[in-house]
Amino acid sequence: PDHHHAYNALGYSLADRSLRLPEAHSLIKKALELAPGDPFITDSLGWVEYRLGNRDEALRLLRRAYAARPDTEIAAHLGEVLWTTGARDEARRIWREGRERDAGNEVLRETLTRLQVKL
């Protein structure tokens, strides 16, 4: 079936748990083929690239997703990749922007807690 949301949701849920990453990557790529330019799918692809250890590609994709749609969950993902590459000031700035938009976002809160970051 050509249901990009379903491919993306399944791929993202696998990637977020670091499960079956090659399968997650394939599912998300399929979703992006069906809905090119969708920032949420681009975010998912960036997230799976990060989980696969491809930080440069992850950063490129997550920056693109965030520029297209500055969503708090995308901010959480972009900030984490920035943080792990040493761009900590930029990560904090992105996270603060995300918090201003949605202070109660669970993904952002979990990310900051796991990385032990205080904003």
PLM region spans:
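Specific register positions within alpha-helical solenoid repeats of the TPR/Sel1-like families, i.e.
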Residues: A15-D16, Y50, W83, V117
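Conserved positions within tetratricopeptide repeat
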Residues: Y7, H25, L59, D89-R92, ...
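Structural signature of tandem alpha-helical TPR/SEL1-like repeats
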Residues: R17-K30, L52-R64, G86-I94
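Structural marker of alpha-solenoid helical repeat scaffolds
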Residues: L34, A67-A68, R101
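Residue-level recognition of tetratricopeptide repeat
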Residues: H3, Y12-S13, D38, W47, D71-T72, E80, N105, R114
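TPR alpha-solenoid repeat register
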Residues: A6, I41, I74-A75, L108
